[in-house]
Amino acid sequence: MTEFDLSTREGRWKHFGSVDPVKGTKPTTKNEMTDLQSTHKNFLFEIEEVGIKNLTYPVLIDQYQTAGLFSFSTSLNKNEKGINMSRILESVEKHYDNGIELEFNTLHQLLRTLQDKMNQNAAGVDVSGKWFFDRYSPVTNIKAVGHADVTYGLAIENHTVTRKELTIQAKVTTLCPCSKEISEYSAHNQRGIVTVKAYLDKNNDVIDDYKDKILDAMEANASSILYPILKRPDEKRVTERAYENPRFVEDLIRLIAADLVEFDWIEGFDIECRNEESIHQHDAFARLKYRK
């Protein structure tokens, strides 16, 4: 058995089974290597989307840096075998400056870079992240950091935007109207998880506070908003407000829809509310879709 010098890292590696590199015969420089994905011939079909998923990368949402989860894609002509996927990351790095600003204009610029670098007609991106914002307790006005989940979706073909979407998921309180109606006192309440997917005007810029407008529609129509910090006067207000505004899941999504339909920069929306029922072992949910 071969003895290795265990006082060195290389010796320890070989002691645990590492071997020397094989002296091969294939090229070792980029210019000499075969570039298979750049092969051009008839590959039968065009591909609408090909790219990468689950790329974690820093993003800026308003004043906070957070982690974004990206999916990038481009189209692929039928006479090309594949795309050069490393160019996707190169395009992302080109737009990096302490995080990619999560706004539609920034994502549009990123897609144009990707489109040109990949030499393809179409490109798309979906990116999810945690949106942090200031939230004040309702009576004592104590500031703390609240959060919601956001997902941006954008796609372009040539110079035209073909998809422009924003999804927000936030948690609220819902108090059961039936429980309030039949009980001598009190009513059961629970945490509701509300998801709004808004299909935005593809031909115009969004208004400055578009996220806040959608979030307000989701939260203000619930029995109560969730707060990071509540003192006793705040808790009293929250409890009483919930009792004054009972909501079924059906009620909540209809009220949210009534607000969203008034926004001329929204072309349509999908809404879902799922209640984690406090008196059942199952959840309750409601869902609706609307297109103008």
From Swiss-Prot:
The record marks C176 as: May be catalytically important. GO terms for molecular function: GTP cyclohydrolase I activity. GO terms for biological process: tetrahydrofolate biosynthetic process. Keywords: Hydrolase. Pfam families: GCHY-1. NCBIfam families: PRK13674.1-1. This is GTP cyclohydrolase FolE2.
